[in-house]
């Protein structure tokens, strides 16, 4: 009897890979993350930088549209012009003629700067202020020039030494006449005011004051006395003259034609008429 070889076959048949043994003991299940956690979050922090500009833009647009609506009702024609200030040399009518071209505009569109410029071009106006007063008024404040002296034959000087030229210049021949280089108007006015103050206690007023191109000073009093001062120590020389005048010249003033202060320690006197012996003695005392 032929022998037969029997082989033990694993269940599952031929050609199958052996199964891995199952792990023994307990196993842990890992829960899956929610979709909202796994997806990247949107960053909206940039919106806070846009909030204020956006708000301002909205407010600005609202104000603009509101103004467009209100302006036709608020922007009225100019109904009244008031002029303030003490006016001695210019008239209300002259002011009205100057500003009349501007009054056709409305309350908000009137050119205040242009109106002020036109007013300050008038020779007698030193300074002008123009402002609106709700709802339909313009108020003008004017400061007139204060003429102190004549500047040669061509202009007047105010108290700041600023020249101005009114049409009626011939009406001010009574004012003292100042002369000097054009660049020295303010300096000459300051010197005039100072010397006038020093001479006033003697009863003298200045009719003419001149500054030469080299800086020398000379004046003529209203009494007709010429005083040569020179360039240096002007105030000291005038004070010396005041002191000597009270002591030796007061009684002879009507006979004095010219006084020369261009000496370091004295003065020289030129007389109108031939001097008497007493006058000669006086003149010798002050030289």
UniProtKB/Swiss-Prot annotation:
Its membrane topology is listed as: Single-pass type II membrane protein
Subcellular location(s): the record lists:
Cell inner membrane
Q: Which InterPro entries match?
A: Cell_div_FtsQ/DivIB_C (IPR005548), FtsQ (IPR026579), FtsQ_C_sf (IPR045335), POTRA (IPR034746), POTRA_FtsQ_type (IPR013685)
- List the Cytoplasmic topological domains: 1-45
Disulphide bonds in the chain: none
A Gene Ontology biological process noted in the UniProt record is:
FtsZ-dependent cytokinesis
UniProt cross-references to Pfam families, sorted A to Z: FtsQ_DivIB_C (PF03799), POTRA_1 (PF08478)
Regarding protein family, the annotation reads: Belongs to the FtsQ/DivIB family. FtsQ subfamily.
Q: Which HAMAP family match?
A: FtsQ_subfam
Descriptive protein name? Cell division protein FtsQ
Organism of origin is Pseudomonas aeruginosa (strain ATCC 15692 / DSM 22644 / CIP 104116 / JCM 14847 / LMG 12228 / 1C / PRS 101 / PAO1)
> What gene, per UniProt, encodes this protein?
ftsQ
């Amino acid at each position: 009897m032929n022998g037969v070889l029997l082989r033990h076959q694993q269940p599952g048949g031929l050609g199958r890979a052996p199964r891995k043994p199952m792990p023994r003991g307990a196993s842990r299940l890992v829960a899956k993350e929610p979709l909202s956690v796994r997806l990247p979050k949107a960053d909206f922090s940039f919106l806070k930088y846009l909030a204020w500009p956006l708000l301002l833009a909205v407010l600005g647009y609202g104000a603009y549209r509101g103004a467009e609506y209100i302006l036709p009702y608020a922007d009225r024609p100019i109904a009244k012009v008031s002029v303030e200030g003490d006016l001695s040399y210019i008239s209300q009518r002259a002011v009205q003629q100057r500003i009349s071209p501007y009054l056709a505009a409305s309350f908000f569109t009137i050119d205040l700067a242009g109106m002020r410029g036109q007013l300050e071009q008038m020779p007698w106006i030193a300074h002008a202020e123009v402002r609106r007063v709700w709802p339909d008024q313009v108020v003008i404040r004017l400061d007139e020039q204060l003429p102190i002296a004549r500047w040669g034959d061509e202009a007047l000087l105010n108290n700041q030494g600023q020249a101005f030229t009114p049409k009626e210049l011939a009406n001010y021949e009574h004012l003292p006449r100042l002369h000097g280089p054009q660049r020295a108007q303010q300096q000459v006015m300051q010197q005039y005011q100072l010397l006038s103050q020093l001479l006033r206690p003697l009863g003298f007023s200045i009719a003419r004051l001149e500054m030469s191109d080299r800086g020398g000073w000379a004046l003529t009093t209203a009494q007709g006395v010429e005083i040569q001062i020179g360039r240096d120590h002007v105030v000291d020389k005038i004070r010396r003259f005041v002191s000597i005048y009270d002591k030796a010249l007061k009684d002879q003033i009507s006979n004095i034609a010219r006084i020369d202060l261009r000496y370091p320690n004295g003065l020289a006197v030129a007389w109108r008429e031939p001097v008497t012996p007493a006058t000669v003695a006086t003149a010798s005392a002050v030289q």
